[in-house]
Amino acid sequence: MNLFTDFEARINRILESIEIIREKRSELDFGRINVEPPRDASHGDVATNAAMVLAKPLGMNPRALADLIVDKLGQDPEVAGVSVAGPGFINVRLSVSYWQKLLAAITRAGVDYGRSTFGAGRKINVEYVSANPTGPMHVGHCRGAVVGDALANLLAFAGYDVTKEYYINDAGSQIEVLARSAFLRYRQALGEDIAEIPAGLYPGDYLVPVGEALADEYGTSLRIMPEDKWVPLVKERVIDAMMAMIREDLAALNVNHDVFFSERALHDNGAARIRTAINDLTFKGHVYKGTLPPPKGQLPEDWEDREQTLFRSTEVGDDIDRPLIKSDGSYTYFAADVAYFKDKFDRGFHEMIYVLGADHGGYVKRLEALARAISGGTAKLTVLLCQLVKLYRNGEPVKMSKRSGDFVTLRDVVDEVGRDPVRFMMLYRKSSEPLDFDFAKVTEQSKDNPVFYVQYAHARCRSVFRQAAEAFPDLDLSSVDFAAAAGAIVDPTEMQLVAKLAEYPRVVEAAALSHEPHRIAFYLYDLAAVFHGHWNKGKENPELRFVNDKNRELSIARLGLVHAVASVLKSGLSITGTSAPDEMR
């Protein structure tokens, strides 16, 4: 039950009952009417701008129209009071019986409260991480991994048919370098002194096991094999090894994908898929042969002062046209991007989200342009850019011992502080803003540590049920109908907690619509704060405690409230990919 959707329907019925609105309905923009929480909670529980939106096209004074609406709203038995503020905002205060009914609905729904049909089963593809398979994941990949995974969870909860996808960049020049780096480690495994790793190769010790595995499988045969024979073999083995390592890193962070799509598949059969995609663009008039003027500043790798096959991307929103086929006949990296998008589109995805690092900002316009060109404007592509993560310890820039190469790995961070703090804190900032991650802060047991504060609220909820089991040993809590007991909840501070729970469905839909999973993390912290505040009031006033062994009926009702809080906390934590512990010590 969505409080705001419910009252939107009630207000719409009232508007339909007003004669002048019925007469001019076709001239009115109902889409601009909002039903939302008031900015100031002291004004009420629900606010609407309906009178402000409709008054001008109706030729009425906003307050006069508001008075008409207020008169009819005041007749609703579940409305305790209605007032008009300012030039015509309408504020509604709900009755105790309405909050009780809502609490009953939340307890019945449990962890499914807030689940929405907003997405209407539409297919959506969320691509995230897509790190080059050239080594273990570093902390720079961590934020995009969490944001993408949590966003996919959120969209599924909001009713979309979600596919989580990883694009394996396994066809570029970096894979050639990786194969040669692994071959060097193979020679080392055979006893050869390789001295220093030559410049340009990958120096990380993570390739040592790959070299040893090659030595075990092939013995000395690779060393005497022609280069054009051993390179493809080593490429295959090292890509498999790197992807196994990356999958382990992702699993450590509780990040999951449904599809791992190999870029090499686009180049199979003479790059048939890339050819098909370019032919499709050509047929639609988006491809021509020409020479691009040199861009300002540093020249990009795909620029040539020769005739190339170009994508006329400036006609579909890009700043410059993009090369597809170089003068030597080879395909550009962007040509594979075109084929990959077409593959997704052909798989039935008309909504796609790419979660990329901030360093990919220059790719946004070209991706949006190819989406318009391939789909004819029918596909919706969204690019989310994740800003950098800076590591600190007690406010000082972190200087960690590095396990591999010269970077801090994702596993370094997860192994030190745990999966839950990493996941939750990666969501505790809007992804477009830089994030400071302090190893000391994320393990503090205080309200200043959001993940602890939220998880502790859930653990406290579960502890209330353990207290109840001791207070009422003859009561089977698993079979109690908490919804039926909700009528005993009457205290104003308890109503504040129900009101905060009532916001959850709206937060879910707004976060899904804006592709902002951080809104869930923010909401969970706010809910935890209201719950902890009520818990502390119970310490000061025994009458407000959740369990009162002298009042069984009231205790059962309050257990229903606690059950509702625990359910929403668990639901939201599940979206963020974070656990909801029953105990915390």
Swiss-Prot record:
Xref: CDD domains: ArgRS_core (cd00671)
Alphabetized GO MF terms:
arginine-tRNA ligase activity; ATP binding
User: Which regions span the lipid bilayer?
Assistant: none
Location of this chain's protein in the cell: Cytoplasm
Q: Which reaction does it catalyse?
A: tRNA(Arg) + L-arginine + ATP = L-arginyl-tRNA(Arg) + AMP + diphosphate
Which keywords describe this protein according to UniProt?
Aminoacyl-tRNA synthetase, ATP-binding, Cytoplasm, Ligase, Nucleotide-binding, Protein biosynthesis
Q: What is its main location?
A: cytoplasm
Its GO CC terms are: cytoplasm
Task: Please state the span of the N-terminal signal peptide per the UniProt entry.
Answer: none
What class does this enzyme belong to in the EC scheme? ligase
GO biological process assignments: arginyl-tRNA aminoacylation
Show where the record puts the motif 'HIGH' region.
Answer: 131-141
Recorded superkingdom: Bacteria
What SMART domains does this protein map onto? Answer: Arg_tRNA_synt_N (SM01016), DALR_1 (SM00836)
EC number(s) stated in the UniProt entry for this protein? 6.1.1.19
Name the HAMAP family on file.
Answer: Arg_tRNA_synth
Subunit arrangement? Monomer.
User: PANTHER family, alphabetically?
Assistant: ARGININE--TRNA LIGASE, CYTOPLASMIC, ARGINYL-TRNA SYNTHETASE
Q: State the family it belongs to.
A: Belongs to the class-I aminoacyl-tRNA synthetase family.
Q: What is this protein called in UniProt?
A: Arginine--tRNA ligase
Species source reads Rhizobium meliloti (strain 1021)
Supply the source organism's classification: Bacteria, Pseudomonadati, Pseudomonadota, Alphaproteobacteria, Hyphomicrobiales
